[in-house]
From Swiss-Prot:
Its main location: membrane. It comes from Azotobacter vinelandii (strain DJ / ATCC BAA-1303). This is 3-demethoxyubiquinol 3-hydroxylase. It is found in: Cell membrane. Transmembrane segments: none annotated. The lineage of its organism: Bacteria, Pseudomonadati, Pseudomonadota, Gammaproteobacteria, Pseudomonadales.
């Protein structure tokens, strides 16, 4: 495109730093879409249920932190402009999920995970490395990551108390969006990862979910 803006390496690094701050600082990410929980009734959960739901939403929030970092790392090193643009668009859409989860966590009188900076750094490194290897690998990581997220969401939807319609509305919309991201990445040429690679990613995701449920 004739009017496409071209950024220098310094510009891109500054943009990545800004994205990191907006991801990690409380309430700094502004959603593009209103929360699906708007209009749903607030149900008083007992203390045990509220703690459990807060733990689940904390896991999902950290998952979105990881997704942001993964996409930003890939956007930094992607070779083709269309792939870079796809990564940046996916990151923008994940901002909605990040903000929705954080808002719900606060409504449950809890807080995001203290481990978010660590997981952001690790995910950014993975994304940047994938982008350096090839755009097909980079897009494949998106698809495989979103598949993992969908599995987490399916499990969490089963665990939610039936009366918690706010959290359910958020997770159901996230599930739709994440599946679309995975499909788009594969259609754009993403590599379908073999089972051993997906198994390794599953193990890593379990480390994240177990640790962020409480911390």
């Amino acid at each position: 495109m004739a009017n496409e803006r071209h950024y220098s390496a310094t510009d891109r690094l500054l943009l990545q730093a800004d994205a990191a701050l907006r991801t990690l600082l409380p309430f700094s990410g502004k959603p593009y879409r209103p929360s699906p929980a708007q209009g749903e009734p607030e149900t008083q959960l007992d203390a045990g249920k509220a703690r459990h739901v807060a733990g689940l939403m904390r896991i999902n929030h950290t998952g979105e932190v990881c997704a942001q970092a993964l996409y930003q790392g890939q956007a930094l090193t992607a070779r083709l402009p269309r792939v870079r643009g796809a990564m940046e668009q996916a990151a923008n859409e994940e901002i909605d999920h990040l903000a929705w989860c954080e808002q719900r966590i606060r409504e449950l009188n809890s807080r995001p995970s203290l481990l978010n900076p660590l997981f952001y750094g690790l995910s950014f490194g993975i994304g940047a490395t994938a982008g350096l290897i090839s755009d097909r690998i980079s897009l494949g990581f998106v698809a495989a990551t979103e598949d993992q997220v969908c599995k987490h969401l399916d499990d969490h939807l089963k665990q939610l108390p039936e009366e918690d319609r706010k959290s359910r509305a958020i997770l159901e919309q996230m599930r739709i969006d994440e599946q679309q991201h995975a499909t788009t990445a594969l259609e754009a040429g993403g590599l379908r990862f073999p089972a051993p690679v997906k198994f390794g990613m599953t193990l890593l995701s379990k480390v994240m979910t177990k640790s962020t449920y409480r911390i």
